[in-house]
Amino acid sequence: MRRVVAQGTFDLLHPGHLYYLTEAKSMGDELHVIVARSQNVTHKQPPIVPDEQRREMVAGLDPVDSARLGHTDDFFVPIRDIDPDVIVLGHDQHHDDERLAEMLTEEGIDCEVARASARDGDDKILSTGRIVDRICEERC
């Protein structure tokens, strides 16, 4: 059984999230998703949707076998619990693939790191930021 981990904020779900999770699922048999807690999102605007609600929405998506919130203090706790064969990063996530692989090795976690491919949106709104911008353009 090949276990795959995907992770992210997953605020205001959109087709880009589904593309990412579908591709991640195709890399294994089980897809486990770690949803970032609001307090740990420091590289961009904080999420609009509460933590548990974002986790629940992700858990309801067809490719997802399990979804959990990330640990408040230690990024590696859920990864150790899941014991994945591969961690798939989103095409636009800020993580450095090589540094993450080094950190996993330092933590004694043996898994590969892959990156999902970018998708052509065909005019679909594929980012939370673009959704928020569109709401402001149309409704504010």
Swiss-Prot record:
This is FAD synthase. Its EC number is 2.7.7.2. Catalyzes the transfer of the AMP portion of ATP to flavin mononucleotide (FMN) to produce flavin adenine dinucleotide (FAD) coenzyme. Pfam families: CTP_transf_like. The keyword Ribonucleoprotein does not apply. Its cofactor is a divalent metal cation. Keywords: ATP-binding, FAD, Flavoprotein, FMN, Nucleotide-binding, Nucleotidyltransferase, Transferase. Belongs to the archaeal FAD synthase family. It is an enzyme of class 2 (transferase). Homodimer. ATP binds at T9, F10, H14, P15, G16, H17, D92. The lineage of its organism: Archaea, Methanobacteriati, Methanobacteriota, Stenosarchaea group, Halobacteria. One of its GO terms (molecular function) is FMN adenylyltransferase activity. Pathway: Cofactor biosynthesis; FAD biosynthesis; FAD from FMN: step 1/1. The keyword 4Fe-4S does not apply.
